[in-house]
């Protein structure tokens, strides 16, 4: 990684503004999944052990620049305290005189969680005044929020113009793993691209076609490719305006010598529900009033074989509507193949793919699960992420 890390800077006795991703699911004022809080612990613990005064800043939900009582970070601060085993204080604002007064009472190693940065309209606009107000609180800026690195916001980009800016350990690991996968991959290198829409994955497919040995397509976006081959897709998801693009991707794969895998059979249903009538049909025989909602058995076996013969697999997007058990077998088959492939380094690109491996209880069998859905996607597209660009070079 060519960016400075938290280890490249002396933080003892200094106030550190650390941007983390604590955008966690909540119910009845309690954190229901603390994965993202745990992911930030190594950086937080390191900063406290080094004697920094640690300010933690995060967004939670989408309050749209207004205070929303149920999106305060109070329950998050409480959960962090339990996980870290020490008192964690909470501020009622994210900047200003009251916060400065609290900071003046902090001792080395203390932690103060600032209020939800998205309560301020300037955050998502990357407002220079808000950026400066955040910077005025601290001596050093650490960004450990890879999940928000694709956003040019005040707390992810603007603040870095005013302070020494370095990466936390989570950010560093994400950039190293994803960077190595794209610049110097072990081969055979396989990418699995799923999810609902071709339009969301155009950039990543274009980028990966230049790098991979095998490209596997699944999920709702597959049916635009099926249609491009001249088959009818019934009531399945279809982007009419992307059919020509799908054809061009298949042509480019052929030109580049990339093995392009698409479903050969699919699970179709007469209704979008768990108790729908379902059957597996060849991809060329989808009934006109049925909808394909998962890959079929033959396709599952083919995809599993490709995975097991790969040295590196990057996975972004499910194979079907895995949230409904009846349509989860394809996504589960991919997750299980990755879990069983001992010689394969597996990179799960956040978002739905990460949720799927969690759901199937296979998360601990994956080599790396990215904490950023949108960020990992943009990184794999070859885009420079604003939150990374803003950090100091080594």
From Swiss-Prot:
Pathway field: Carbohydrate degradation; glycolysis; pyruvate from D-glyceraldehyde 3-phosphate: step 2/5
GO CC terms: cytosol
Kinase found in the keyword field: yes
SUPFAM superfamilies: Phosphoglycerate kinase
UniProt subcellular location: Cytoplasm
Residues in the signal sequence: none
The name this protein goes by in its record: Phosphoglycerate kinase
Organism: Bacillus licheniformis (strain ATCC 14580 / DSM 13 / JCM 2505 / CCUG 7422 / NBRC 12200 / NCIMB 9375 / NCTC 10341 / NRRL NRS-1264 / Gibson 46)
